Design a protein with these regions (language model features):
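Active-site beta->alpha loop and helix N-cap motifs at the rims of alpha/beta catalytic domains
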Residues: 60-125
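Catalytic domains of carbohydrate-active enzymes, especially glycoside hydrolases
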Residues: 22-40, 110-111
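Active-site-adjacent beta->alpha loops and helix N-cap segments on the catalytic face
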Residues: 16-17, 47-48, 76-80, 105, ...
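Active-site beta-loop-alpha junctions enriched in small/polar residues
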Residues: 10-12, 40-42, 99-101, 120, ...
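N-terminal small/glycine-rich loop or linker at the start of catalytic domains
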Residues: 1-14, 54, 58-67, 81-82
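Hydrophobic faces of well-ordered beta-strands that scaffold small-molecule active sites
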Residues: 5-9, 35-37, 94-97, 113-117, ...
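Catalytic alpha/beta core domains of metabolic enzymes, predominantly
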Residues: 147-174
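Glycine-rich, proline-tolerant flexible connector loops at the mouths of alpha/beta enzymes
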Residues: 33-74
Protein backbone atom coordinates (compact mmCIF):
# COMPACT_ATOMS: atom_id res chain seq x y z
CA UNK A 1 0.00 0.00 0.00
CA UNK A 2 1.44 3.40 -0.93
CA UNK A 3 1.99 6.12 1.63
CA UNK A 4 -0.82 8.67 1.74
CA UNK A 5 -0.09 12.14 3.10
CA UNK A 6 -3.02 13.79 4.87
CA UNK A 7 -2.76 17.52 5.59
CA UNK A 8 -4.65 18.36 8.78
CA UNK A 9 -6.68 21.53 8.35
CA UNK A 10 -9.27 20.76 11.03
CA UNK A 11 -10.89 24.05 12.00
CA UNK A 12 -7.64 26.01 11.73
CA UNK A 13 -9.27 28.09 9.00
CA UNK A 14 -11.03 30.00 11.81
CA UNK A 15 -14.35 29.80 10.01
CA UNK A 16 -13.06 31.42 6.81
CA UNK A 17 -13.95 29.49 3.65
CA UNK A 18 -11.28 31.40 1.73
CA UNK A 19 -8.64 30.40 4.28
CA UNK A 20 -9.84 26.77 4.11
CA UNK A 21 -9.42 26.85 0.33
CA UNK A 22 -5.97 28.40 0.70
CA UNK A 23 -5.02 25.60 3.10
CA UNK A 24 -6.11 23.05 0.48
CA UNK A 25 -4.10 24.82 -2.22
CA UNK A 26 -0.96 24.96 -0.07
CA UNK A 27 -1.41 21.32 0.99
CA UNK A 28 -1.59 20.34 -2.68
CA UNK A 29 1.53 22.39 -3.48
CA UNK A 30 3.38 20.65 -0.63
CA UNK A 31 2.54 17.22 -2.03
CA UNK A 32 -0.31 16.17 0.24
CA UNK A 33 -2.78 13.67 -1.19
CA UNK A 34 -5.67 14.59 1.09
CA UNK A 35 -6.70 17.64 3.10
CA UNK A 36 -8.83 16.91 6.17
CA UNK A 37 -11.36 19.20 7.81
CA UNK A 38 -13.99 18.75 10.54
CA UNK A 39 -17.77 18.69 10.16
CA UNK A 40 -20.15 19.20 13.06
CA UNK A 41 -23.42 20.65 14.17
CA UNK A 42 -21.99 22.56 17.15
CA UNK A 43 -25.17 22.39 19.24
CA UNK A 44 -25.03 18.58 19.09
CA UNK A 45 -21.47 18.24 20.35
CA UNK A 46 -20.91 21.16 22.75
CA UNK A 47 -23.02 22.05 25.78
CA UNK A 48 -24.19 25.64 25.99
CA UNK A 49 -22.87 25.53 29.56
CA UNK A 50 -19.35 24.42 28.63
CA UNK A 51 -16.60 26.85 29.54
CA UNK A 52 -13.57 27.47 27.40
CA UNK A 53 -10.21 26.12 28.41
CA UNK A 54 -7.85 28.68 29.94
CA UNK A 55 -5.68 28.87 26.82
CA UNK A 56 -8.82 29.56 24.76
CA UNK A 57 -9.87 32.34 27.12
CA UNK A 58 -6.44 33.91 26.69
CA UNK A 59 -6.39 33.71 22.89
CA UNK A 60 -10.05 34.40 21.99
CA UNK A 61 -12.94 36.42 23.39
CA UNK A 62 -13.02 35.37 27.04
CA UNK A 63 -16.65 36.49 27.36
CA UNK A 64 -18.01 34.09 24.74
CA UNK A 65 -18.94 30.50 25.58
CA UNK A 66 -17.29 27.38 24.20
CA UNK A 67 -20.37 26.84 22.03
CA UNK A 68 -20.22 30.38 20.63
CA UNK A 69 -16.56 29.91 19.75
CA UNK A 70 -17.18 26.51 18.12
CA UNK A 71 -20.06 27.92 16.07
CA UNK A 72 -17.63 30.42 14.53
CA UNK A 73 -15.18 27.67 13.57
CA UNK A 74 -17.53 25.27 11.80
CA UNK A 75 -18.91 25.54 8.29
CA UNK A 76 -22.45 24.91 7.13
CA UNK A 77 -23.06 21.77 5.11
CA UNK A 78 -23.35 23.97 2.00
CA UNK A 79 -19.91 25.45 2.66
CA UNK A 80 -18.49 21.91 2.93
CA UNK A 81 -19.94 21.14 -0.50
CA UNK A 82 -18.24 24.22 -1.92
CA UNK A 83 -14.97 23.27 -0.24
CA UNK A 84 -15.11 19.75 -1.68
CA UNK A 85 -15.78 21.15 -5.15
CA UNK A 86 -12.76 23.41 -4.77
CA UNK A 87 -10.57 20.51 -3.64
CA UNK A 88 -11.75 18.47 -6.63
CA UNK A 89 -10.93 21.36 -8.97
CA UNK A 90 -7.31 21.57 -7.79
CA UNK A 91 -6.74 17.83 -7.57
CA UNK A 92 -6.55 17.15 -3.85
CA UNK A 93 -8.91 14.78 -2.06
CA UNK A 94 -11.30 16.38 0.43
CA UNK A 95 -11.78 14.51 3.71
CA UNK A 96 -13.69 15.46 6.82
CA UNK A 97 -14.16 13.98 10.27
CA UNK A 98 -17.85 14.13 11.24
CA UNK A 99 -18.48 14.72 14.94
CA UNK A 100 -22.19 13.84 15.04
CA UNK A 101 -24.71 11.64 13.26
CA UNK A 102 -26.22 14.34 10.99
CA UNK A 103 -22.70 15.21 9.84
CA UNK A 104 -21.94 11.54 9.11
CA UNK A 105 -25.09 11.28 7.03
CA UNK A 106 -24.39 14.57 5.24
CA UNK A 107 -20.84 13.60 4.31
CA UNK A 108 -22.14 10.26 3.05
CA UNK A 109 -24.27 12.12 0.49
CA UNK A 110 -21.15 13.72 -0.98
CA UNK A 111 -19.77 10.51 -2.47
CA UNK A 112 -16.53 10.62 -0.51
CA UNK A 113 -14.28 7.58 -0.92
CA UNK A 114 -13.26 7.77 2.74
CA UNK A 115 -14.44 9.05 6.13
CA UNK A 116 -12.36 9.66 9.26
CA UNK A 117 -13.60 8.88 12.72
CA UNK A 118 -12.63 11.61 15.20
CA UNK A 119 -10.16 10.33 17.81
CA UNK A 120 -12.54 10.89 20.71
CA UNK A 121 -15.36 8.87 19.13
CA UNK A 122 -13.64 5.46 19.18
CA UNK A 123 -15.62 4.45 22.28
CA UNK A 124 -18.92 5.89 20.99
CA UNK A 125 -20.27 2.57 19.74
CA UNK A 126 -23.68 3.89 18.53
CA UNK A 127 -21.80 6.51 16.47
CA UNK A 128 -19.54 3.78 15.05
CA UNK A 129 -22.64 1.78 14.07
CA UNK A 130 -23.85 4.77 12.03
CA UNK A 131 -20.40 5.14 10.44
CA UNK A 132 -20.35 1.45 9.50
CA UNK A 133 -23.84 1.68 8.01
CA UNK A 134 -22.58 4.20 5.44
CA UNK A 135 -20.60 1.38 3.77
CA UNK A 136 -17.67 3.74 3.20
CA UNK A 137 -14.04 2.94 4.12
CA UNK A 138 -12.93 4.68 7.32
CA UNK A 139 -9.79 5.86 9.04
CA UNK A 140 -9.73 4.89 12.71
CA UNK A 141 -7.26 6.87 14.86
CA UNK A 142 -6.13 5.12 18.02
CA UNK A 143 -4.03 7.68 19.89
CA UNK A 144 -6.17 7.87 23.00
CA UNK A 145 -7.32 4.25 23.04
CA UNK A 146 -6.59 1.00 24.80
CA UNK A 147 -6.24 -2.24 22.88
CA UNK A 148 -9.66 -3.36 24.18
CA UNK A 149 -11.27 -0.13 22.93
CA UNK A 150 -9.69 -0.59 19.52
CA UNK A 151 -10.88 -4.20 19.39
CA UNK A 152 -14.42 -3.17 20.34
CA UNK A 153 -14.48 -0.42 17.71
CA UNK A 154 -13.22 -2.78 15.01
CA UNK A 155 -15.91 -5.30 15.99
CA UNK A 156 -18.69 -2.71 15.67
CA UNK A 157 -17.38 -1.48 12.31
CA UNK A 158 -16.99 -5.02 10.98
CA UNK A 159 -20.40 -6.16 12.25
CA UNK A 160 -21.97 -3.08 10.68
CA UNK A 161 -20.56 -3.83 7.26
CA UNK A 162 -17.82 -1.23 7.02
CA UNK A 163 -15.93 -2.35 3.90
CA UNK A 164 -12.45 -1.26 4.99
CA UNK A 165 -10.82 0.16 8.10
CA UNK A 166 -7.38 1.75 8.13
CA UNK A 167 -6.02 2.03 11.64
CA UNK A 168 -3.97 5.14 12.36
CA UNK A 169 -1.42 4.81 15.12
CA UNK A 170 -1.38 8.28 16.61
CA UNK A 171 0.66 9.80 19.38
CA UNK A 172 -1.95 12.01 20.95
CA UNK A 173 -1.76 14.62 23.67
CA UNK A 174 -4.95 16.65 23.96
Amino acid sequence: MPVTIIAEAGVNHNGSLEMAKEMARVAKECGADIVKYQTAVPELVVSKFAEKAEYQKQTTDAAESQLEMIRKLHFSFEAHKELKEYCDSIGIQYLSAPFDVPSVKFLSTMGLPLLKIPSGEITNLPYLEVMAAQKTPVLLPTGMSTLDEITDALGVLDDGGCPEVTILHCNTQY
